[in-house]
């Protein structure tokens, strides 16, 4: 472990479960991100007074949804990191948009904590990692898979909808720890049947949709790679590299367990290659199951589809196509803008209170107790979640999990799974 790295003790490092040291590092991470988002490209090197604006803040610019608002230039008081924003190459004007588009309905601290845990609480490394992830999200247009329907995505990326129609991958139910379960039927994959970009976009689609199903306090997902019937014709090394990169660089700390189920003998030669690509954290989350009954060690029998021996849930995956008119709320620009303004108003308050929280106890403190400030941050985080999911149907296309008589994804952001036992 590198100098300055800190292991996350069990039961810590999560929203509401921070040690004093972890809280300080989270404050520093927030301070740096807000400093950059306010238009500064250099590291936070000074400790300005509370009455003075941070250096360069008078030149702050906004991008995306935040183009018309001036930055709150309240100074932040933390040590500097050594991150060169110019070298990373992210457009500072788009940073705030990337940040809040990524947070969705989660507690804002949750996102930053994922990157801090992934980099063992080294703020410089965590900040570099999250900025690179934001750059990827902007350059690869991750919002596209949320704002476009499956039919629109299929028209642009050959084979996108095919992944859903064949049931190559889908989400159903939760495991014993309450994590949503993503099933991947590897035998269905033939590299030539879709454009590589379509498979990447579908993977991101599953990631972004699956995030909606991770319900607090749960923070991770369970993946089942069903290797039944696998042959070398199904192997796609480029896709595996992309998936590994997603979990390690773009969606860190999102994987709870990855189960490789019933891998045939031919897979073990492939595994020796893949194993070398994995960082120790991801590798530690991989579990092998030899038969169907072993799956019940991970997933309760009542939640496990009965296609697996020991499973009691009479569930069979079936794709429900796009429903005509399901995204008509996109046309209601007036309501969308009103809800967007309400959501933005709350997040601006959250940022302002976060800056106050960063300074709590220091010479530039506001005078309110840290406990009082934290209570307001928590209240605002809850308001943000409510406001986001009111806005969601006006900016996110409805998907498979919004459809049907018993949809999984609810209007308030909760998930309801139906099991047929």
Placement of each model-derived feature along the sequence:
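Basic, amphipathic alpha-helical/coil surface patches used to engage anionic, phosphate-bearing ligands
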Residues: 1-421
